A protein has these predicted regions:
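Terminal presequence/propeptide segments associated with secretion/organelle targeting
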Residues: 1-181
Length: 181
């Protein structure tokens, strides 16, 4: 998962970094967003480096081999734990694509273009309207939403968001190419 997540975040960061270099207003608008996106990006890069440096995959494989030998050489353990690692691998393989797809969606929708989060911010208003119609409660929620929108637009640049949307949509489709009709 980390390589895909790093790639998605790097794609967003490339668009944001280029825009931030273009003018001071955009640099100020996107400083916190860039930082938020890059924190996990840097963490995952560090995790991958650490796993390689410590040869974690090789050590895991050696430990699994030792476990299988111990189990195989002990009848009681073999009856109880024989085939356990194979079953775990089968379960992991069965869910691997679902986990990947879930995290790809999260990276695209929740950490990608602000357009998605912006649209989602209206969900409460839609539900209130469906439940209570044109009520005072709906009007009050609408006023709160207006205040939220003012803060949103203060640090929003539609050109940057479109750039992120375009770049991430291409990545998203590339990663999902095997699932498309």
């Amino acid at each position: 998962l980390n390589p895909m997540r790093i790639d998605m975040r790097a794609t967003s960061l490339n668009v944001i970094d280029a825009a931030m270099r273009s003018d001071d207003k955009t640099r100020i608008q996107y400083a916190a967003k860039q930082s938020r996106i890059s924190n996990a990006y840097k963490k995952w890069i560090g995790q991958n480096r650490g796993l390689k440096k410590l040869k974690a995959v090789k050590k895991k494989q050696e430990t699994e081999k030792e476990f299988e030998e111990l189990v195989h050489n002990n009848k009681e353990w073999n009856d109880q734990y024989g085939g356990l690692l194979a079953k775990l691998k089968n379960n992991q393989d069965a869910f691997e694509q679902s986990f990947f797809d879930r995290w790809l969606f999260i990276e695209y929708v929740y950490y990608g273009p602000e357009l998605f989060r912006f649209a989602n911010s209206f969900e409460k208003l839609v539900k209130l309207y469906e439940e209570k119609g044109n009520s005072q409660e709906l009007r009050n929620a609408g006023l709160k939403q207006t205040a939220v929108l003012e803060g949103f637009y203060k640090d929003f640049n539609s050109d940057v968001d479109q750039g992120i949307f375009k770049a991430l949509t291409e990545k998203y489709l590339d990663y999902n190419s095997g699932h498309l009709p």
